[in-house]
Amino acid sequence: CVIFGGEPTVHVKGNGKGGRNQELVLQILKLINHSNNILISSIATDGIDGNTKYSGALIENNLIKPKIISHFLKTNNSNSFFKKYGGLIKTGHTHFNLMDIGLILKY
């Protein structure tokens, strides 16, 4: 298990919907796509991730083709990916901004 904190940066290349936490989870998913039994999550402690009403995402590694993941990453449209495949986390505004927190768990 890896637990991490901080605020990742995203180089915006498209005009999609998403935030740095959703994008980070999608980037990690692309990297570990061929591994088994891994859970990835990253959330904004203030409850707002980028230009969405979600705080982040949670997903298990799966069989989604890297080409599909790359399409959503190229347009910075991670929110649409998670709406389609599941995994969005919605906490609402927490009025508390410590930092982003994440988890990568091998089970």
Question: PLM features: residue spans?
Answer:
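Internal helix-turn-beta structural module
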Residues: L26-Y107
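A glycine- and small/hydrophobic-rich beta-loop-beta segment
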Residues: C1-N21, K30, H34
